[in-house]
Amino acid sequence: MPRHERGGSGTSSSDLRLRKACDRCHAQKLGCQREAIGAKCVRCEKADKPCTWSISLRNRRASTRKEQLPVHAQQQQQQQQQHQHQPQHATMARNENNEEQAQEDDNDDEDEDILYSDQLTPSEAIPELHSPLGDPHNRLASESLDPTTMPIDLTSFLISDGGLGLMTPSLTNPGSWLGETQLGTTTTTTTAITTATLIGEPPRFWSSATGGLPHTPSAGGLTTIDLPPAAFEMNLPGVPPSYTPSHQPDQPPPPKTGTPALSDPQWLKELFDNNARLYRNWHAVSSNMTTNQTINPLFPMSTTSQSHPSSAAFADEAVQLSTQLIHILRGLLHQHHESTGHRPPTTPKPRARAEDLDPDHSGLDPGSLLIVLSSYFRILEIFTMLSHALEATAAATGSTTHYHTPRATPPILRLPAIVVGSLDLASNTSLSTVLFLEVIEDLLTTLATLVLSIAQWPSHPHHATSRREPGWQGSDLHAGSDRLGLQIQGKEDEIRRVIRAIRARLGRKGDKAGV
C-alpha cells in the first residue's frame, strides 16, 4: 500500500486522493486535527509517532478501474462480436448494470472515512451465535436435510396429526373411537386410539379407571372433541420415537422372578374387560343379522333411533376393540420377556393349529390362555359376519367395478365414516370398502402373530404339568383346544375367501398373502 508522510522526514503533499485522517486516527475511529498543512496531527505529535496518510479506498478503486478500462473495453468488444445477432437492448442493460454497480460502489465509499472498520462480525466474535445451517461455506449446510446427520436434536419435536392436518386422529368414525355419549347419560369418554397399528406404532391404550368404552354404541352423530396435539406423534425417519411422561402408555411394573406371566392384575382386568365388550359387540351384530341379506339391511338406516344403532357404530367398535386387544397382547409378550428372559418367536407359524394351542406348551396359565383365544375367536366371528354383509351388499348392487348403492335399495352394511385429511370418503363407497378391508386384514395379521407367539411360549416352571395329570392331556379341555384350533383356521380361511370375492367385485383380482 503506498503511503505518504506529512511532516517529519516525509515529503509534504496535498494530494486530494489521501484520506482526511491519518492512518492511526483512521484505525482508531478518532478525529484527526493538525495545526497546519503538512504537519503531524495532534495525537501523533503528542505520542511522538510517525503521521502517515494513505489513499482512500474509493480512490484506489477508481484508479484500478481506470487501469483496467482498456482490458474491459477489449473484452466487451469481443463479446459484442460473438453476440452480434442478439438484441441490442441486452447489451444496453448490461452496460446500465455496470454503471449502477459502479455508482453504488462510489456511494458506499463516500462515508468510508467514518464507517470503515475491521471489526469482527457477531458470528465470528461469538462462535455460539454461528449457525451451520445458514453458512453456505459449511459442509453441513448441504446435509442438513438428513435427520441422521443434522446437528439438531429432533427427538424433542412432536409433530402432531392435528397440527399438520395430514390425517384424522382415527382411521374410522371419530365419534365412537375418540369419545361418544352413552345412551341415557351425558358423560363422554375420550380414548386415544390412533391408526398406529397400521404403521407399527404401539397404540395409546385406554384406561379402565376412566370408564373405558361405552357399553353400547350410541346412535347419535359424530361428536367433536378437542384433543391436545401432544396426544399424537409422528416419527421422523432415522430418529427414534420420544415419549414424554404426559402421554406415555401406562406400562405395568416388571414382575418378580419366578412369578407367572400374568402377575399384574391390571393386565388381567383389561383382558377380561376387552373380552366382555367383544362379546357384547358380537351379540349386537349377530342378533341383527337377517336371513335374507340381499333384501333387508343388516341394521336400520335411521341413526336417530335410540333402540336401533347403526351398523357403522358396531363395525367401528369392532376395529377399536381389536386394536385394544393388540395392545394388551403386546404388553403380555413384553412382560413375559422381562420375567423369564425368553424372547418369544418373531416369526410364528402363520396358521393356527391344534399343537400350537396346547396349554402344556404355553407359559400362560390355562385360564389366561383361554381368555386370549376366546377374544381372538370373537374377533374372527365379528369380522366374518361383517365381511359377509359387505359381500351381500356388493352383490345386491350388481356392479363389478364400482360399489355404489342405489338410492332405492338401502345398504346392507353401513361402513364407518372414514376421513383422511380433508378428504371425506363417504361419497366414494368403493374406496371406503377397499380401505376397510385393508384395516381388517392388517388387524387380523397382527392378532394372529401375537396369539400364536403367546401360544408357542415355552412352558413356565410354575405352569408345567405332567401329561398324566388329570384335567389336561386327554381331557375335555385339551380336546376343546383342538376343536378351537380347527375353528380358528376355518374362520381365517372364510374371511380370506370373502375378501377375495369382494375385491373381485370391485375389480381387484389379486389378493394379499394371508390374513
UniProtKB/Swiss-Prot annotation:
Gene of this entry: himB
Q: Where is this region: Disordered?
A: 62-110, 125-147, 231-263, 336-361
Keyword check for DNA-binding: yes
Family matches, as InterPro entries: Zn2-C6_fun-type_DNA-bd_sf, Zn2Cys6_DnaBD
* GO MF annotation terms: DNA binding; DNA-binding transcription factor activity, RNA polymerase II-specific; zinc ion binding
Which residue ranges have biased composition labelled Basic and acidic residues?
A: 352-361
Name listed for the protein in its UniProt record: Transcription factor himB
Q: Which lineage?
A: Eukaryota, Fungi, Dikarya, Ascomycota, Pezizomycotina
Q: Where does this protein reside within or beyond the cell? A: Nucleus
Q: Name one GO biological process term.
A: positive regulation of metabolic process
- Alphabetized UniProt keyword annotations: DNA-binding, Metal-binding, Nucleus, Transcription, Transcription regulation, Zinc
Stretches with biased composition (Acidic residues): 98-110
Q: What does this protein do?
A: Transcription factor that, with himD, probably co-regulates the him gene cluster that mediates the biosynthesis of himeic acid A, a ubiquitin-activating enzyme (E1) inhibitor.
The organism encoding this protein is Aspergillus japonicus
Q: Which residues bind DNA?
A: 22-51
- Could you state one GO cellular component term attached to this entry? nucleus
